[in-house]
Amino acid sequence: MERYESLFAQLKERKEGAFVPFVTLRDPGIEQSLKIIDTLIEAGADALELGIPFSDPLADGPTIQNATLRAFAAGVTPAQCFEMLALIRQKHPTIPIGLLMYANLVFNKGIDEFYAQCEKVGVDSVLVADVPVEESAPFRQAALRHNVAPIFICPPNADDDLLRQIASYGRGYTYLLSRAGVTGAENRAALPLNHLVAKLKEYNAAPPLQGFGISAPDQVKAAIDAGAAGAISGSAIVKIIEQHINEPEKMLAALKVFVQPMKAATRS
């Protein structure tokens, strides 16, 4: 959890926002997946948001569902994902690593055991996409016992009650949703979200990162101008992986070309 605090403090000092890419672990296979993560960090990623493949990803649009299918085709298991997370942490000791996943994968292990494993491999946060705030107690309590930040989604239509709960229970960062629906770069982020950002700040919530539909530098800049601490981009990155699936070197070059201007847009 402390890695998020020190990241946001450093960025504030440098007058920058955070750029956070999302990818699915082991898409399209373990070696290339590790190279992808190294490339994202070299190109300027401030933190990582990583998906553990799940057979029924409700919040994901077709792009990320395809990434999940590719990972399954490569024979992915949650145990292998944790081995991979340990490797990433070893190589990148200071970058915050967040997991974005579904409740079944947490239950499979046993809630406490799952978060214990996260702590062991150096995961900083976990967002369980299909667990609403009001049902989150066993997850967030286990997370905090193991020094893992529980992350909550703040939807664009959040009422005051929900905003207070998110502020009270969340740690690390707050996932500020650009719009309702499933993930996807095709549906551009709807702005502005100034009123939500102001309320979250008022209630002392963890810094908001805006996600869903973030696919261009102007959207990153707009999110930060609206008061967000940064932006998360997933489908646009996963699409690049898909487009260059048979050209691993081209894929890495294209990812670099995408991430550099996205990071540059966080600088005021």
Swiss-Prot record:
This is Tryptophan synthase alpha chain. SUPFAM superfamilies: Ribulose-phoshate binding barrel. The alpha subunit is responsible for the aldol cleavage of indoleglycerol phosphate to indole and glyceraldehyde 3-phosphate. The keyword Cell membrane does not apply. Its EC number is 4.2.1.20. Tetramer of two alpha and two beta chains. NCBIfam families: trpA. Keywords: Amino-acid biosynthesis, Aromatic amino acid biosynthesis, Lyase, Tryptophan biosynthesis. GO terms for molecular function: tryptophan synthase activity. It comes from the Bacteria. InterPro entries: Aldolase_TIM, RibuloseP-bd_barrel, Trp_synthase_alpha_AS, Trp_synthase_suA. The active site is at 49 (proton acceptor), 60 (proton acceptor). Belongs to the TrpA family. It catalyses: (1S,2R)-1-C-(indol-3-yl)glycerol 3-phosphate + L-serine = D-glyceraldehyde 3-phosphate + L-tryptophan + H2O. Pathway: Amino-acid biosynthesis; L-tryptophan biosynthesis; L-tryptophan from chorismate: step 5/5. It comes from Shigella boydii serotype 4 (strain Sb227).
